[in-house]
Amino acid sequence: MKEELLKRFTKYVKVDTQSNEESKACPTTPGQMELANILVTELKEIGMQEVTVDEFGYVMATLPSNTTKEVPVIGFLAHLDTATDLTGKNVQPQVHENYDGKDIVLNKDLNVVLSPKQFPELADYNGKTLITTDGTTLLGADDKAGITEIMVAMNHLINHPEIKHGKIRVAFTPDEEIGRGPERFDVEAFGAKYAYTMDGGPLGELEYESFNAAGAKITFNGNSVHPGTAKNKMVNAVKMAMEFNAHIPKDEAPEYTEGYEGFYHLISLNGDVEQAKAYYIIRDFDHLKFVERKTHIASIAKELEEKYGEGSVELKLNDQYYNMREKIEPVKEIVDIVSAAMRNLDIEPKISPIRGGTDGAQLSYKGLPTPNIFGGGENFHGKFEYVALESMVKATEVIIEVARLFEEKE
């Protein structure tokens, strides 16, 4: 299993599937369709049935039931795209066997070092096989570890018919990182009663609560005048953006929050005297606080527009997804069965809220309750991203055990 996981994973991460928020297409980048087509071929090769990919890059496939019992159809999902935070082009995965607990030099020329001083959780991986970046890209374990684990689990079940299971559906979706994954996902065609995303982090993570999420695009329109004659005429759009940000509570940012605490996050700010654009994301687990945060953003925009004149501040505020807890708690047994599967494999479940989002958050609101299971990765979205091969083995085993337990309990 280890060898197959390593071979597939290192192949998948070399396909550049970074999504693009500026694109209106689906998928937003051609690399996602490239990977989708690779997976379609491989799904057919291992013996999966009803293998399809649509024009939008959604891959679906079926592993038929091998039991006479009436077992609910379950699904496993992972996303094709990688994050926009750092390039996913020319990913060169590095394999470090029997990690010794010391610094790992990712890139000597650029002095990029993965160090337990900065990332103390590395101590948990002594003796493990770590797959890292070369220090110039992200790795793409989010979520190609999940894709790999689903592929290997299905292959294992096909080759081990003694493991009884109901009908299993798998899906690989585009553009999750920019919040569009479920937009064109056909829940009815997928045909599962329950599903799981393999999109979590370290070993044991199990999540069924997510943020309520919104995005705020703000355009500041200034007035550029020659600096020598600018008095009482110039309006500096960049300074307007700075003034806007000064109204955001400094301690309510990602770098100062954890657990159930929400935040405002300035993703990007660019511009000049004439015009500047800022993009914020707004996150909170509590719906009332979420609404309050959006109201605060809108009130700052209104205040500045009143100060600088009509049209000086343009705000586009949109909801992205909601906390899926509301949709999963009525069917909490689908979380309990994963906890049982983990314990059967000597994994202690770590149930915590997702400080982020998964396709499952939106799918749960489309009628498909979808908790999130660990994929094994650490430090997602950056050059220090890595995954332990042993964690990927465990995630694969969890998929297999969940399928077995669903059949056993009927």
From Swiss-Prot:
Cofactor requirement: Zn(2+)
PROSITE patterns: ARGE_DAPE_CPG2_1, ARGE_DAPE_CPG2_2
Main localization (coarse): cytoplasm
Its biological purpose: Cleaves the N-terminal amino acid of tripeptides.
Gene3D superfamilies: 3.30.70.360, Zn peptidases (3.40.630.10)
Residues that coordinate or bind Zn(2+) 1: H79, D142, D199
Cofactor note: Binds 2 Zn(2+) ions per subunit.
Protein name: Peptidase T
Gene this protein is translated from: pepT
Originating species: Listeria monocytogenes serotype 4b (strain CLIP80459)
Subcellular location: Cytoplasm
Family: Belongs to the peptidase M20B family.
The keyword Methyltransferase is annotated on this UniProt entry: no
Catalytic activity from the UniProt record: Release of the N-terminal residue from a tripeptide
InterPro entries: ArgE/DapE_CS, Bact_exopeptidase_dim_dom, Peptidase_M20, Peptidase_M20_dimer, Peptidase_M20B
Sequence positions that bind Zn(2+) 2: D142, E177, H381
